[in-house]
Swiss-Prot record:
Lineage of the species this protein comes from: Eukaryota, Metazoa, Chordata, Craniata, Vertebrata
The SH3 domain, residue ranges: 42-112
Annotated gene: Mia
Tissues and organs where the protein is expressed, per its UniProt entry: All malignant melanoma cell lines tested and infrequently in glioma cell lines.
PTM field: May possess two intramolecular disulfide bonds.
Iron listed as a keyword: no
The protein's name in its UniProt record: Melanoma-derived growth regulatory protein
Covalent S-S links between cysteines: C35-C40, C58-C129
UniProt key word Disulfide bond: yes
Length: 130
């Protein structure tokens, strides 16, 4: 098959046209968050899910009752009902953990690992979907 320059150009542009529809900034849930460190990389606490929660979009985590959740941030202001964290991806830990938000009301904090004392401004990457 012979590729014409126009057809080849269309294929190249469609492949390298930028982020896909799944890669996008989503609306911010809050302007501020509480973290344990300045990178928000250390978990504040460990919590246990009291009920199932199905993520409404890619910013959120789907969590099942009984799962251990690592809390990395607590949103402030208008988003104060949501915390940021991760759960292990598979039953035996064979899948990578994913970060996302969930309602604070569905978990019970069982262990404080490092108190959340640092107020951080959120940015677009805090609510970016991939």
């Amino acid at each position: 098959m012979v590729w014409s320059p126009v057809l080849l150009g269309i294929v190249v542009l469609s492949v390298f046209s930028g982020p896909s529809r799944a890669d996008r900034a989503m609306p911010k849930l809050a302007d501020w968050k509480l973290c344990a460190d300045e990178e928000c990389s250390h978990p504040i606490s460990m919590a246990v899910a009291l009920q199932d929660y199905v993520a409404p979009d890619c910013r959120f985590l789907t969590i099942y009752r009984g799962q251990v959740v690592y809390v990395f941030s607590k949103l402030k202001g208008r988003g104060r009902l949501f915390w940021g964290g991760s759960v292990q991806g598979g039953y035996y830990g064979d899948l990578a953990a994913r970060l996302g938000y969930f309602p604070s009301s569905i978990v019970r904090e069982d262990l404080t690992l490092k108190p959340g004392k640092i107020d951080m401004k959120t940015d677009q990457w805090d609510f970016y979907c991939q």
